Amino acid sequence: METVETLNEGLKRNYTLTITADEIRKRIDQEVAEAAPRVNLPGFRPGKVPAKLVNKMYGASLAQDALNKALQDGVQKLLSDKGEKPAMQPEIELTEGYELGKDAELKVKFEILPEVPEISFDDLKLERLTVEADNAVIDEKIKEFAEHQKSFDDSKKDHKAENGDLVVVDFVGKVDGEPFEGGTGSDMSVELGAGQFIPGFEEQLVGAKQGESRVLKVTFPEDYSVPYLKGKDAEFDVTVSDVRVPRKAEVNDDFAKSLGLESLDQLRDLMKGQIEQELNGLTRTYMKRKLLDQLADSYSFEVPSQMVEAEFNQIWRQLEHAASHEEDSEAALAEMEKERDEYRAIAERRVRLGLALSDIGAKNNVEVSQNEMNMLISQAAQRYNPADRQRFVEYLRQDPMMAAQLRAPLYEDKVVDILFEKANITDRAVTREELEAAIEAEEDSIGKHDHDHDHKEKASDKPKAKKAAAPKKKAAPKKKAAPKAEKKSSDE
């Protein structure tokens, strides 16, 4: 095998690789020898079909397999011999006009992972915004919890339904005067004001009494889940069989005991623990964002353009999806186009920051243990139906890239913990409102403060895509954390 370097510029590497016909022939002979024992033909004992006959029957497909393997092995040997670490899968192009029996010449193109420069962490300064879970906050949370545990009592016969009441109805839905599939039901409970039904349904039941019949006129939303009902006007013939009023929950020892606890004090302790966990999560989110901002400002090394392009494409697809659900999707898309360069800069920042975090983790011997990985797999499997969980686990164990994506957030959090230990941290007591406002202020700042490595937020918590006259720019969608640097095929 011969290799010739044709480009060495920055992170870009191009090679011409020649694999001799003799090497390919040896690989074909090996493929035939390995396939022969598995071939069964009438007149031959199992596994005793002559290699020449196997070659005659399956030679073309075996030759193609052998060529592909020879090319892949050649590329791997090239990378090993040159000590190159590609950032993504190399591009391989076989010279046009190749014929079996001749030398194979291929062009190999890739970008290498950059060397991440050493920086000092002595200047890392962070402010930890802390919120106390005081008695007032605990009482308010318990009150909210009690309201969600509410039960209903029978009302007087002449009671008119109000918001908050539970109305039990039988109904027949009609479109163009004809009942439609799924539009008929009985003994359905409707909590007025809960907003669980199509617009207008609950509102038109306000004032209804037990035994009363009404015709409710509604319009199905344009985004309704049933296609043939989208945007359709409909009427529901409704009969109210019962109206029940909410029972006010009293927060006391009896309420706590109804939840299986010993006392109200135990409920308060549990609620305090949950609130503190939530507040600590918000505090960490703010600190992590500030930390990543400082790290991003500290690094300026070149990053692989392929990784940036892949990251940008991922951002852009998510933005296009969000824009397609705007009232004026064309205006939202046009606004996105104006900011294309900014989103590309965000993609570059993400890649650089991901590589830096991976490098810091590697130099500090950060690892995700097998027990931790098993726990991550188990947690991820819970999102699937019980019948599908084992298949998911088996698939994950066979797919290194999927496993890397699952491992990445925990790996990154371990790196962040190390950096927290190295940083100079000062504490400042704030209210929850002030902490959330500080996080939102970070969220609203697009370029510099794009917090792509924060896993604590859901996509639904992000601002909606920008409309034509909106004053605020849409933040780039979140991505998964960067894995260790040795995962070459992706920055994920």
UniProtKB/Swiss-Prot annotation:
State any GO BP term from the record: chaperone-mediated protein folding
Keyword Glycosyltransferase listed? The answer is no
Skewed-composition ranges (Basic residues): 464-482
Keywords annotated in UniProt: Cell cycle, Cell division, Chaperone, Cytoplasm, Isomerase, Rotamase
- Entry GO terms, CC: cytoplasm
Which reaction does this enzyme catalyse, per its entry? [protein]-peptidylproline (omega=180) = [protein]-peptidylproline (omega=0)
- One Pfam annotation reads Trigger_N
The family line of this record is:
Belongs to the FKBP-type PPIase family. Tig subfamily.
What is the recorded name of this protein?
Trigger factor
